[in-house]
Swiss-Prot record:
The modification N6-lipoyllysine is found at residue 63. InterPro entries: Biotin_lipoyl, GCV_H, GCV_H/Fam206, GCV_H_sub, Single_hybrid_motif. It comes from Staphylococcus carnosus (strain TM300). Keywords: Lipoyl. The glycine cleavage system catalyzes the degradation of glycine. The H protein shuttles the methylamine group of glycine from the P protein to the T protein. Binds 1 lipoyl cofactor covalently. This is Glycine cleavage system H protein. Belongs to the GcvH family. It comes from the Bacteria.
Length: 126
């Protein structure tokens, strides 16, 4: 199972790619595998503020609906509009095509609370 080393991870199975004071957020390969076939993704609007540990959207699969929890606080600067028409990208390419939001960080120190790839692998039993 892919757990890219350059990313950070939340305990709620979101991945975070850090690019200066902006982060890109998506869900992990492990999470999409647990959810099954993704049929709908609900994301916030551009310029919405999201708060660490609070829901900022949801992913619906044939089995269930799962909330997305913000690993950091900040302002949404971009959403992946392709997921509206192609939610299956979450299953096919969770780390590339299926990024969900880009967020301008409010507090970079929140990144210190996230897991490394090795810590995340340990958490999911890899």
């Amino acid at each position: 199972m892919a757990v890219p080393e350059e990313l950070k991870y939340s305990k709620e199975h979101e991945w975070v790619k850090v690019e200066g004071d902006t982060v890109t957020i998506g869900i992990t390969e492990y999470a999409q595998g647990e959810l099954g076939d993704i049929v709908f993704v609900e994301l916030p609007e551009t310029e919405d503020d999201i708060e660490e540990s609070e829901s900022f959207g949801s992913v619906e699969s044939v089995k269930t609906v799962s909330e997305l929890y913000a690993p950091v606080s900040g302002s949404v600067v971009e959403i992946n509009e392709e997921l509206e028409d192609s939610p299956e990208f979450v299953n096919e390419s969770p780390y590339e095509k299926a990024w969900m939001v880009k967020v301008k960080l409010n507090d970079e120190s929140q990144l210190d609370d996230l897991l490394s790839a090795d810590q995340y692998k340990e958490m999911i039993g890899e």
